[in-house]
């Protein structure tokens, strides 16, 4: 089976808690290689553009405000079934519903401050990766 790529963002709440290393360990233990990574402070324009699919939703402004509230860690993960595997280790969007041992169950505070973002499909993964990374920035691992 071919290896997939997926995008992951460690959100401002998890960066502020200094749990980046713990989250990276979970990726690697699940067989997901980190092939690109950067820490950045998103601008309002970047956050609005990235989450444009949610623009008409009532939570859009709060989501954008949260995503620009502090630095984020953005990474590309590579592995067998990377999209599904990453979503499994992230846990449910609402940390109260997330399975024990998932990233959100262990590190998220609320449905808004929920520690991580992960692509939900291969198509969205390709779009999201291209939003943050040039092809030459992805390492072959």
UniProtKB/Swiss-Prot annotation:
UniProt superkingdom: Bacteria
Any GO molecular function: ATP binding
Enzyme superclass (EC): transferase
One GO CC term on file: cytoplasm
Listed GO biological process terms: CTP biosynthetic process; GTP biosynthetic process; UTP biosynthetic process
Localization, UniProt: Cytoplasm
Entry-linked SUPFAM superfamilies: Nucleoside diphosphate kinase, NDK
Pfam family, one: NDK
Binding site for ATP: 11, 59, 87, 93, 104, 114
Cofactor section: Mg(2+)
Record keyword Ribonucleoprotein present: no
Catalysed transformations (reactions): a 2'-deoxyribonucleoside 5'-diphosphate + ATP = a 2'-deoxyribonucleoside 5'-triphosphate + ADP; a ribonucleoside 5'-diphosphate + ATP = a ribonucleoside 5'-triphosphate + ADP
InterPro entries to which the protein is assigned, alphabetical: NDK-like_dom, NDK-like_dom_sf, Nucleoside_diP_kinase, Nucleoside_diP_kinase_AS
CDD domains tied to this protein: NDPk_I
EC number(s) per entry: 2.7.4.6
Alphabetically ordered keywords of this record: ATP-binding, Cytoplasm, Kinase, Magnesium, Metal-binding, Nucleotide metabolism, Nucleotide-binding, Phosphoprotein, Transferase
Catalytic machinery residues: 117
HAMAP family referenced in this protein's UniProt entry, alphabetically: NDP_kinase
Record family assignment: Belongs to the NDK family.
Function: Major role in the synthesis of nucleoside triphosphates other than ATP. The ATP gamma phosphate is transferred to the NDP beta phosphate via a ping-pong mechanism, using a phosphorylated active-site intermediate.
Subunit field text: Homotetramer.
Record-given protein name: Nucleoside diphosphate kinase
Gene encoding the protein: ndk
